[in-house]
Regions:
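Gram-negative and organellar
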Residues: 1-187
Length: 187
């Protein structure tokens, strides 16, 4: 499997920026004796994104994004679909932490019916994703360990609620994550 993508942004005045992107993916399933249908899910995907960021003030920024993706699988039934995404986020750059809150919706429309689940019915799902992330520089807590404040701890919570026209695809998930990241300059 592989994925390629490109994107960029441009500013409009001092408080607005527009971002855009394209990604291509070619995913390959690992077909073996325990998964004899993996080859059928091999898919080519194209996705496009467009976003707008706005600086409200030194503390608050907002972002709105739209996306479209099209996935075409080797075997169509239940694997070919289009996704339409829309999300809104608000970010707070507090002196003590960076907090990002985002709420988004994804609409999935499948192109052919999956006969293994429901004959003749085209699957259609909507998923609501809410997440909150808190980021803090380790150097703010332990200056001796990270004097440049380039090592971060990230805590996040995500809730996904999906509803489909086929009951098998309704679900609610909650997830928490803890991660560490480091920033550096290449010049």
């Amino acid at each position: 499997s592989f994925m390629y993508g490109a994107g960029s942004f441009f500013s409009i005045g001092e408080r607005n920026s527009i971002s855009y992107g394209y990604a291509f993916s070619d995913s390959k399933g690992n077909q073996n004796s325990t998964d004899t249908t993996a080859d059928e899910t091999n898919a080519i995907g194209h996705s496009f994104t467009l976003g707008h960021d706005f600086i409200v003030n030194e503390l608050i920024t907002t972002n709105i994004s739209l996306g479209f993706s099209d996935t075409d699988a080797k075997i169509d039934a239940g694997n070919d679909y289009e996704t339409y995404d829309a999300s809104f986020g608000i970010n707070f750059a507090f002196p003590w932490a960076y907090i990002a809150v985002t709420n988004g919706y994804s609409f999935n429309d499948y192109k052919k019916a999956d006969s293994s689940v429901s004959t003749g019915r085209l699957r259609s799902d909507v998923a609501n994703t809410f997440d909150i992330m808190v980021t803090k520089a380790i150097g703010d807590i332990f200056p001796a360990i990270d004097p440049n404040r380039s090592f971060f701890i990230n805590l996040s919570y995500e809730k996904i609620q999906s509803e489909g026209n086929i009951l098998n695809y309704d679900y609610i998930t909650d997830s928490f994550s803890l991660s560490f990241s480091r920033s550096f300059n290449l010049n």
